[in-house]
A protein has these predicted regions:
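RNA-binding accessory domains that recognize and position tRNA/RNA substrates
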Residues: 1-179
Length: 179
């Protein structure tokens, strides 16, 4: 069995959720948001719109199919929304250490560690989602070893400029011009 480290999610209203790490172990902060998207976790984690946010998927079990190979078609990734994880962290209910899929190359935990993104499991995400639904998105922080970081509000920064491409990128040279 792996050596699992405890950590906690602290919301700006003082609510504390205890969990266990399965990703990178670093105290971070951001806006805590839940998502109900019908996409996989690789797509959600690499979605640039989640920059600065701590994601809470409403689906209870995450990690069961691992992380796919980084495959491209016509210069566009087949399984990711961008070239890296953009969210600050991910909070889930149940983490599957055993993953299985014909296209997986590594575990979600391994990928999070490589990308230096914390992940916590064992948190009641239903209760957390209900709280966020009733009170709106809240600032939060993940604390390891009682090391606290200031709350960070990504809405105060120009996140679009941070995640946008710096130059024009053309995909394909087809007959039609799509704008």
């Amino acid at each position: 069995m792996q050596n699992l480290k405890k950590a906690r999610l602290v919301l700006q209203d003082g609510t504390v959720y205890e969990g266990t790490s399965f990703g990178y172990e670093k105290s971070v902060s951001g806006e805590v948001v839940f998502y109900t998207a019908m996409t996989g976790y690789p797509e959600s984690l690499t979605d640039p719109s989640y920059k600065g946010q701590i994601l809470v998927p409403t689906y209870p079990m995450i990690g069961n199919y691992g992380v796919p190979v980084d495959d491209e078609e016509n210069g566009v990734s087949k399984f990711f929304e961008s070239d890296k994880i953009h969210c600050t962290a991910i909070i889930i209910s149940d983490y599957s250490f055993a993953y299985s899929h014909w296209n997986s190359q590594k575990s979600l935990g391994q990928w999070l560690k490589e990308q230096q993104v914390p992940g916590l499991f064992g948190i009641d995400t239903r209760a957390l989602t209900k709280k966020l639904r009733e009170h709106g998105a809240m600032l939060g922080r993940i604390e390891f070893d009682n090391i606290s970081v200031p709350f960070y509000d990504p809405n105060e920064d120009n996140i679009v400029a941070e995640v946008s491409t710096k130059e024009v990128i053309e995909y394909g040279h087809g007959k039609y011009k799509v704008v």
